[in-house]
């Protein structure tokens, strides 16, 4: 079962090491990890994706919450959410194949962010399968891909639901009361 944990952690040295050490101790591989500043100064938002049983997922969530400097944790894999990933893909581009690459970029709704006489860099944001699709097509021409950099998954719940940390800041209280029946039912699953 795939788990997507969203945690708010204090912006302090060693926090990421503690999180990674927990997964090492549990012998669970981290499939994706992103960390960045949140809407609250001094806190970062950590999104972590892993494969584990439902029972192990519950243990992971509880263990994450017990870690020093972890303020809030939620497993939102089953919740209605939006997940995106960013990829930068540098490809070899000659005048002969450049038009073909431009067409491919347009089909995948990506964009060119850097262009030289010998290469170009593609930026693409989307779901993992869409990014994998572009990479697969680019790999059909051996030697075309020079370098790939991917962000990892970023996930946020749909609708008005916000974490308890955001609620404590006074944001989203009224919005939570307006949650639709559909969102409420999805939260109970």
Model-identified regions with their sequence ranges:
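Long, contiguous binding/interaction regions
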Residues: 1-4, 8-45, 49-189
